[in-house]
Amino acid sequence: MMNKIHKNNRGVLIVISGPSGAGKGTICKALLEKHDDIFISVSATTRNPRVGEVDGVNYHFLTKEEFKQRIAEDDFLEHAEVYGNYYGTPKSSVEKMLDEGKNVILEIDIQGALKVKEKATDGVFIFILPPSMEELKQRIIKRGSETPESLMTRFKSAYKEINYVSKYNYAVVNDNVEDAVKKIEAILLAEKCRVDRLKENLLESKEDEMHEQLYD
């Protein structure tokens, strides 16, 4: 009897970036709420926990010595120092989740994403775009936390960031969160069906089938 092709159980690493105001956080939250096989990576940091933050949930809180030791052990997909504190994406915990069949989201900035791309070549890199720069402006203004000067700074930063879209595998325009989520779901499904992800399992199933034909 012919064996079934083994299911590809390894999860997919989904790296999501985009300019401030594009809606990255809202999209990631919607994906997490909708799918029980999608998880978000918990970053590590050396900063002190804020009120209500839980170690292992909001961040993995490390001492600077522990963080530097992990850097020496190459245990970060990416890391950076911001205002005297270190932040990074632990490689071992991401790999553990992927091996367990969990799809893992990294919502990180562009520089961090490009560093991850150097180490995680099988990751799926998605850039979230606003429908227009005018819409982006309105979204940022609605937050009510920007001065005219900081608003201009954000716009200049957004223009620069959008130039990096060609470094990503996919671009998703977020004119509607529900539609953007559907597009990412379609991307994830297509990535799961890629031959290079299934190749090892396909070969194993062929070997099992040949063994049955010869010895059964």
Curated annotation (Swiss-Prot):
Residues 11-189 form the Guanylate kinase-like domain. One of its GO terms (molecular function) is ATP binding. It catalyses: GMP + ATP = GDP + ADP. Keywords: ATP-binding, Cytoplasm, Kinase, Nucleotide-binding, Transferase. Its EC number is 2.7.4.8. ATP binds at G18, P19, S20, G21, A22, G23, K24, G25. Disulfide bonds: none annotated. Essential for recycling GMP and indirectly, cGMP. This is Guanylate kinase. It comes from Clostridium perfringens (strain SM101 / Type A).
